Amino acid sequence: HRQEVCHGDCNQHNIIFTREGIGFMNFDYWHCGPQTEDLCLFMRKILEKHNWDPELGRRMAEQYNRKRSLSVEEWKHLKLCLSYPWRYWKLVNYYASSQKVWISRKNIEKIEQATALWQPWQRFLQSFC
């Protein structure tokens, strides 16, 4: 994989639109790595909010690919990153590191939301690439 500068927290909250163009802010998590990590994070955040719509995911990846052509290896890496259950990992990691003996109602709701997205996510992955 190409090692390039990655934003590290590439989501809609860190994008700014100006008259001069589009830019990013908040580089607290920047690092060197494959930029498909940033693309994956951005796509995942948007697609979770759109029930993992395969058509939206395809359009997002195609538009990115128009501006910066992805190699076969980068397409594979993107699919691999999108295949990882980040949301579950984040919830389980938070619970395990909090050292609490109970799960808050809010976290139960987050687990339920993640579970509700499981089937749409699997359908998306089957149709992607």
Q: Model-found features: residue ranges?
A:
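Active-site activation/catalytic loop segments of kinase-like enzymes and analogous catalytic loops
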Residues: 36-69, 82-100
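Conserved ATP-binding subdomain of kinase catalytic cores across diverse folds
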Residues: 73-74
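ATP/Mg2+ or Mg2+-diphosphate-binding catalytic cores
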Residues: 89-129
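Detector for Asparagine
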Residues: 11-14, 26, 51, 65, ...
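Alpha-helical structural elements
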Residues: 24-25, 59, 81-84, 113-116
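Short flexible/disordered coil segments
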Residues: 9-11, 27, 69-70, 113-117, ...
